[in-house]
Amino acid sequence: MSGTNNVAQARKLVEQLRIEAGIERIKVSKASSELMSYCEQHARNDPLLVGVPASENPFKDKKPCIIL
């Protein structure tokens, strides 16, 4: 039984390695420069950088707490 399990595991491993071998790879330097360029181009639309206008913020309290 363990022999068939080992064969099945080995086949799964080989299949996974074939999939990974087919993935296109690029150098980290190229990927990082593309990522930096993308971030710089889209920074003006990023709510974490520019903030969300109070009128458009769905999490802002509409009314203050009356209890306090």
Curated annotation (Swiss-Prot):
Modified residues (N-acetylserine): 2
Tissue spec: Expressed in a variety of tissues.
Source organism, top-level taxon: Eukaryota
Membrane topology designation: Lipid-anchor
Propeptide: 66-68
GO biological process: behavioral fear response; G protein-coupled receptor signaling pathway; locomotory behavior; receptor guanylyl cyclase signaling pathway
Gene3D superfamilies: Transducin (heterotrimeric G protein), gamma chain
Cysteine methyl ester, modified sites: 65
GO molecular function per UniProt: G-protein beta-subunit binding
Lipid attachment site numbers (S-geranylgeranyl cysteine): 65
GO CC annotations, alphabetized: heterotrimeric G-protein complex; parallel fiber to Purkinje cell synapse; Schaffer collateral - CA1 synapse; synapse; synaptic vesicle membrane
UniProt name for this protein: Guanine nucleotide-binding protein G(I)/G(S)/G(O) subunit gamma-7
Gene source species: Rattus norvegicus
